UniProtKB/Swiss-Prot annotation:
Keywords noted in UniProt: Disulfide bond, Glycoprotein, Immunoglobulin domain, Leucine-rich repeat, Membrane, Repeat, Signal, Transmembrane, Transmembrane helix
First and last residue of the signal peptide: 1-22
Compartmental location: Membrane
Domain LRRCT: 368-421
Ig-like C2-type domain sequence ranges: 421-514
Entry's transmembrane regions: 629-649
Intrachain S-S bonds: C444-C496
Record lineage: Eukaryota, Metazoa, Chordata, Craniata, Vertebrata
One Gene Ontology term, aspect cellular component: membrane
CDD domains according to UniProt: FN3
UniProt domain LRRNT: residue ranges: 23-69
Membrane topology value: Single-pass type I membrane protein
Protein name as annotated: Leucine-rich repeat neuronal protein 3
Cytoplasmic side: 650-708
């Protein structure tokens, strides 16, 4: 009991002390600002309870004259502060300073000599134009510096001297036109560098070599068209890199090979037109690959993504022209679990693509124009345990009988095992105007079972097979046509043809050079009859014009007195020899070659030719066949006569009906077999090259109408 007064005095003293401190704190807090304890994460992501002074959005013109002594975080965002004067009253424990969205125009107006403990400084959305030498050298403990969205056009080589503890540097959205590797000599511990959305003209070799501890590099939105092979040399600890929203037209494969520990790669929103063989290969630590939102991406070629033993996820979505993925595009990816391919222009995905991914757990191919035929039938064959994401958005676009149906609801037996090739409409444009001397590529890809072969036909009718190399043309094995140094002579119609055992598909592009076609010289067309037989005629032709369409028409009119048969054929323009077969002996024909040009004019020429007559042996053979045929016909008529006689003797049958049937049968008009069965049309195989007809059309005109 004697100790009670003492305890009361102690508690009273503590209460008075706390009250005095609270009053002092309240007095020190700047007017209109909020002073309180708030959660805060350090640059190294350590959580702490920090004494925070919040003076955001108050229209302040000057830095607060007095702050609580224990202030750790000072927020001055969205004011009109243009200068920070020297003061002896700066809190010595200040670790975070946010001066974003103010009116600062020079770093020299920011006096930070009394802020040695600062860890984070935010200077975003001010009017800073340059960083002079040693401008922040007193901040030896600084770990984060944000200078995004300023007007920086100049950074002195020694601007960051003294910031040897800096971990994060953000320079996005300024006016920098170059990157100087000397900037980084003073930043050996930098882990994150963001320098996107600057008008940087190009990146040079060894630009980032001093950043030996860099882990994340973001070079987004700076209109880069290429990355030098040695640009990333020295970044041995780099784990993540983003080239988002640049103008790269191909994967910077050689540069990426120098980053041996890369785990995350972002190439989203670049106009890369194809992922080529080996573009992503032997990157032993890569875990995630992003190739989304690429407006020009058409195909992912064979072995494009190869030997990435740690890759877990591929995202290739929202690519409006991505219409082809080679069956062997993804190879040696033992840990790949997630394959995102939704919202592209894919008509199919080969089963072989999926079979090559042993650990695949989920796939997304919805929102694609799926053609429900042989290539995609594996989906419904219950041969996979892979989870399809958003299956309710997976619909058939073709063929018409399945249009609008959910792919998973079409039975695999309703889809053929083999099917025609299909060249995606998005592969290349139908018309293109190019400048003289330029280089152009057309990427032709087709899906089918069996897999199709692809070749090209030039305006002159020249056939270009895969791996063909000339002075002007090169056809890649995948089907890409390169035209080098375009001149007016290269103008005209180029046709890609995809063919397999089932049939063929074609797609053409009309090229103008400097807005016009080559001059039309009213080129000649010559026809030559190379061989005449009793049942066939071999015809060839030559056109001086080099601007033919990809189809040639052939027609033949039989000029015998009673014949009305005519046939026609459309064939590729690279075929200039044609064999007309199954013709009638000793018969005069009119053969016409009709060649349309890109000027909507036609080169047409006709010749008359008479087939040979049959030799004596053939005549004797045909006579024997005719005798045999007549004997069989006589026997057949005899049997019919007996049947009719028996029918007449029967009281239940009408004899007149039988006589009427025989009479009608015998009165059938006669006609040549060639008129009823048009001659088969075969392409002439010249040498070892095999050409496939795109469309063969045979018609018979004016046959007798009362054949029954």
């Amino acid at each position: 009991m004697k100790d009670m007064p003492l305890q009361i005095h102690v508690l009273l003293g503590l209460a008075i002390t706390t009250l005095v401190q609270a009053v002092d704190k309240k007095v020190d807090c700047p007017q209109l600002c909020t002073c309180e304890i708030r959660p805060w994460f350090t640059p190294t992501s350590i959580y702490m309870e920090a004494s925070t002074v919040d003076c955001n959005d108050l229209g302040l013109l000057t830095f607060p004259a007095r702050l609580p002594a224990n202030t750790q975080i000072l927020l001055l965002q969205t004011n009109d502060i243009a200068k920070i004067e020297y003061s002896t009253d700066f809190p010595v424990n200040l670790t975070g300073l946010d001066l974003s969205q103010n009116n600062l125009s020079s770093v020299t107006n920011i006096n930070v000599k009394k802020m040695p403990q600062l860890l984070s400084v935010y200077l975003e959305e001010n009017k800073l134009t340059e960083l002079p030498e040693k401008c922040l050298s007193e901040l030896s403990n600084l770990q984060e510096l944000y200078i995004n969205h300023n007007l920086l056009s100049t950074i002195s080589p020694g601007a960051f001297i003294g910031l040897h503890n800096l971990l994060r540097l953000h320079l996005n959205s300024n006016r920098l036109q170059m990157i100087n590797s000397k900037w980084f000599d003073a930043l050996p511990n930098l882990e994150i560098l963001m320098i996107g959305e600057n008008p940087i003209i190009r990146i040079k070799d060894m630009n980032f070599k001093p950043l030996i501890n860099l882990r994340s590099l973001v070079i987004a939105g700076i209109n880069l068209t290429e990355i030098p092979d040695n640009a990333l040399v020295g970044l041995e600890n780099l784990e993540s890199i983003s080239f988002y929203d640049n103008r790269l037209i191909k994967v910077p494969h050689a540069a990426l090979q120098k980053v041996v520990n890369l785990k995350f790669l972002d190439l989203n929103k670049n106009p890369i037109n194809r992922i080529r063989r080996g573009d992503f290969s032997n990157m032993l630590h890569l875990k995630e690959l992003g190739i989304n939102n690429m407006p020009e991406l058409i195909s992912i070629d064979s072995l494009a993504v190869d030997n990435l033993p740690d890759l877990r996820k591929i995202e290739a979505t929202n690519n409006p022209r991505l219409s082809y993925i080679h069956p062997n595009a993804f190879f040696r990816l033992p840990k790949l679990e997630s394959l995102m391919l939704n919202s592209n222009a894919l008509s199919a995905l080969y089963h072989g693509t999926i079979e090559s991914l042993p650990n695949l757990k989920e796939i997304s191919i919805h929102s694609n124009p799926i053609r429900c035929d042989c290539v995609i039938r594996w989906i419904n064959m219950n041969k996979t345990n892979i989870r399809f994401m958003e299956p309710d958005s997976l619909f058939c676009v073709d063929p018409p009988e399945f249009q609008g149906q959910n792919v998973r609801q079409v039975h695999f037996r309703d889809m053929m095992e083999i099917c025609l090739p299909l060249i995606a409409p998005e592969s290349f444009p139908s018309n293109l105007n190019v400048e003289a001397g330029s280089y152009v590529s057309f990427h032709c890809r087709a899906t089918a079972e069996p897999q199709p072969e692809i070749y090209w036909i030039t305006p002159s009718g020249q056939k270009l097979l895969p791996n063909t190399l000339t002075d002007k043309f090169y056809v890649h094995s995948e089907g890409t046509l390169d035209i080098n140094g375009v001149t007016p002579k290269e103008g005209g119609l180029y046709t890609c043809i995809a063919t397999n055992l089932v049939g063929a598909d074609l797609k053409s592009v009309m090229i103008k050079v400097d807005g016009s076609f080559p001059q039309d010289n009213n080129g000649s067309l010559n026809i030559k009859i190379r061989d005449i037989q009793a049942n066939s005629v071999l015809v060839s032709w030559k056109a001086s014009s080099k601007i033919l369409k990809s189809s040639v028409k052939w027609t033949a009119f039989v000029k015998t007195e009673n014949s009305h048969a005519a046939q026609s054929a459309r064939i590729p323009s690279d075929i200039k020899v044609y064999n007309l077969t199954h013709l009638n002996p000793s018969t005069e024909y009119k053969i016409c070659i009709d060649i349309p040009t890109i000027y909507q004019k036609n080169r047409k020429k006709c010749v008359n030719v008479t087939t040979k007559g049959l030799d004596p042996d053939q005549k004797e053979y045909e006579k024997s066949n005719t005798t045999t045929l007549m004997a069989c016909l006589g026997g057949l008529l005899g049997i019919i006569g007996v049947i009719c006689l028996i029918s007449c003797l029967s009281p239940e049958m009408n004899c007149d009906g039988g006589h009427s049937y025989v009479r009608n049968y015998l009165q059938k008009p006669t006609f040549a077999l060639g008129e009823l069965y048009p001659p088969l049309i075969n392409l002439w195989e010249a040498g070892k090259e095999k050409s496939t007809s795109l469309k063969v059309k045979a018609t018979v005109i004016g046959l007798p109408t009362n054949m029954s």
